[in-house]
Every structure is written in C-alpha cells, then in structure tokens.
C-alpha cells in the first residue's frame, strides 16, 4: 500500500501509531475516493465511535511535523532518482487551481502523461498569483531538483517577462505562454503577437526580441505556432511561447507537457479524490493535500506496475487497437485496482459460490484469481 522505501522515511518522523494511522488513511482514500473528513471517518476501520474517529482525524491533520519537507520530499527525491538519471531534463509545471475561497499554487514534475506534486502553497486571496509568490515556490523546487536540468512550464497567468528574466538568472529553461495582445519589437516596430499574421498550420520563431514595452528585462525568444485542423478540430488561436529554447519544435514540444498538470488536477478533483468536497482550510487542507499526494503517487506507481504485467484488462476496459490516445492512465488503473481487490475481499464467499455454479468457466476464473494475486502483490 505504501512503498517500502517510503516506510523508513515516515517512521523517522512519525510515531508508530501515527504511521499506522497514515497507512489506514491512504487505504481509505484509495477505496472511498473522497477526502471529505466525514466520509473518511465513516470508512476508517477503527472500532471506536464515529465522532471519536472524526476527532482523531482532525488531530492528525493538526500535527505540525506532517509537512512537505520532512514527510514528502525524501520519498519524492528517491522516486525521481529512480526514474531519471542525474542531469536529466525534468519538466515542471507551475499552475494554480481554485474553488470557493480556496486558492492553491502548485509546482509538479511531469511523469507518464500526469504530474507528481512537488510543492504547493495556499494563497490567502482570490485570483491570480503575483511574481513574489511564483518565485518563492519556484526557488524551493529548483533547489530541490538540484543536479537536474529543469524546464519550467506555465500558462498565461505566468506570462510576465519579469518571471522569464528571473528564471534566466536561475539558469533554468522555461516555456511561458503569452497573451495575444503582448507587444514584441520586430525590426524596430512594435506589434501585438496576434498581428504577426499566423494562420492554422503556420509557425514562426522570433529570436532575441523585446517583449512588452517595459524596459530592463533584456531580450527573449518567442515561439509561435498555430496548429492545423486535425480530425475536424482546430485551435481557436495560436500559441505564443516566451522561452530561452532556440527552436519552435523544442519550445512547442516542451510546452505541450504542461497539460499533464491539468490532468493531475482533474484526478485530484472529480476524477479521483474529490478534493473540492473537502471542508477544511489552512494547515489542515495543506496536510490533507499531502495525504492525497501520497495516495496519488502510490496509485500511479501501482497502476504502472499493473500495466507492465499486462493485467490492466482485469481492472478497466481494454484499449482500442487503433486509438492513438490512452483510455486509462496508470493512476486510474491503480485506483480502480484497489476497488476490485477490496470488493473481492469483502464478497469472497459469494464469489466462490458463483464459481462453483459456473464450473464450465473455472479455467477463466483461475486465470482471474491468478491475476488478482499478482495485482494484490503490487498494492
């Protein structure tokens, strides 16, 4: 349920009772797929009163040593070392998600068409983040990823040339999408990016141009591309990417990876753990996100292992042969494997009876039981 190499990290910072409670909570998250405290307390398998379980959960989320630096980063650093060699290129996406009065700024590393959260902060305001908030969180991540080549990806909220200049000073690569009305100076003439004349299927690379009419930022490269119509779909507008890469292809290919963090947010919300249903704020929410991050990465790794074994067809609908995009992510496979195994354990006697009634299908059932054993070994 929790990787063995992570057990030692947690046991160094948690008491044995706290460690066991965390393991229970991760297991509950994988099966109920809901982070509302009442729903977690309902499913928490402790033989005490419901209200006692709820208060126990609240006290756990109030425990200060449960934080990113001590209980998350050691395992994440180990995982990154396992999946990327030293000096490898790591794509990290900076993005913000919000609902109600909650506003979260997060940086994640791109992995397997999804993203792993590295660091996050709760903004005490509504709306966009500012440069100070962006550079503060990015500096922590850049220092954490020392020894790797970091590429920072950001959408139009993070379009500021000030951020681009700061990233240049940190000696990291970046791809920051620009708004269409951003001004660039080309051949001594100022133009808005949308006035460059791009049409679907066209691309353009502006080398070392001034971006915005404000002074003191130096020059940047701007990669421009408007994707052609494909399968009846055409983007409404072109992409304009502020970057320190030297080609359109490299810039666009890198920026496309940014959408993996949006898939991750979808997994954390309605596609997985229903984060928006959480009725907690402040430090409790911060630590709840930490629990979700542990559960999310754990399920993703388990799903990847199940896919490598070729057993995903026992957990979810099989992929179509001619379909270019995957139907299910490794996270989806891992999360739903927990549900399948859990139901088998709860209904084992009934299933055994059904198998005896349908004896002509016993060879298929035996294959399924073997698959169940192998899948259980990954969880």
Where are these regions (language model features)?
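Single, function-defining residue in the core of a domain
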Residues: 1-34, 71-73, 87-90, 101, ...
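Active-site- or DNA-interface-adjacent structural scaffold in DNA-acting proteins
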Residues: 27-30, 44-100, 154-155, 168
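Amphipathic alpha-helical interaction segments
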Residues: 39, 56, 289-293
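Short beta-strand scaffold segments in enzyme catalytic cores
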Residues: 105-109
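Short, charged amphipathic recognition helices of the HTH superfamily
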Residues: 32-42
């Amino acid at each position: 349920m929790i990787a063995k190499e992570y057990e030692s990290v947690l046991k160094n910072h948690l008491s044995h009772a706290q460690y066991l409670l965390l393991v229970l909570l991760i297991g509950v998250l994988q099966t109920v797929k809901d982070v509302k405290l009442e729903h977690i307390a309902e499913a928490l398998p402790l033989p005490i009163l419901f209200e006692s379980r709820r208060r126990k959960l609240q006290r756990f989320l109030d425990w200060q040593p449960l934080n990113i630096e001590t209980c998350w980063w050691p395992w994440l650093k180990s995982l990154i070392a396992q999946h990327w060699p030293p000096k490898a290129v790591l794509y990290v996406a900076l993005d913000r998600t919000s609902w109600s009065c909650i506003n979260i700024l997060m940086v994640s590393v791109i992995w397997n068409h999804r993203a792993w959260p590295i660091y996050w902060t709760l903004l005490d305001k509504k709306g966009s983040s500012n440069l100070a908030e962006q550079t503060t969180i990015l500096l922590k991540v850049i220092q954490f990823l020392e020894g790797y080549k970091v590429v920072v990806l950001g959408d139009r909220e993070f379009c500021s040339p000030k951020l681009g200049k700061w990233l240049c000073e940190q000696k990291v690569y970046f791809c920051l999408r620009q708004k269409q009305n951003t001004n660039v100076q080309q051949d001594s003439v100022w133009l808005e990016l949308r006035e460059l004349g791009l049409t679907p299927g066209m691309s353009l690379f502006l080398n070392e141009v001034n971006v915005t009419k404000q002074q003191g930022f130096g020059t940047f490269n701007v990669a421009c591309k408007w994707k052609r119509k494909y399968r009846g779909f055409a983007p409404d507008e072109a992409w304009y990417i502020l970057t320190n890469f030297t080609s359109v292809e490299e810039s666009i290919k890198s920026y496309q990876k940014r959408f993996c963090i949006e898939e991750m947010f979808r997994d954390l919300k309605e596609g997985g753990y229903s984060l928006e249903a959480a009725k907690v704020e402040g430090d409790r929410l911060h630590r709840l996100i930490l629990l979700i991050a542990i559960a999310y990465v754990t399920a993703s790794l388990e799903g990847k292992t199940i896919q490598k074994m070729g057993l995903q067809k026992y957990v979810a609908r099989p992929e179509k042969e001619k379909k270019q995009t995957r139907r299910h992510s490794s996270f989806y496979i891992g999360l739903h494997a927990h549900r399948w195994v859990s139901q088998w354990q709860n209904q084992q006697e009934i299933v055994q009876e059904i198998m005896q009634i349908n004896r002509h299908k016993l060879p298929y059932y035996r294959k399924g039981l073997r698959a169940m054993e192998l899948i259980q070994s990954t969880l």
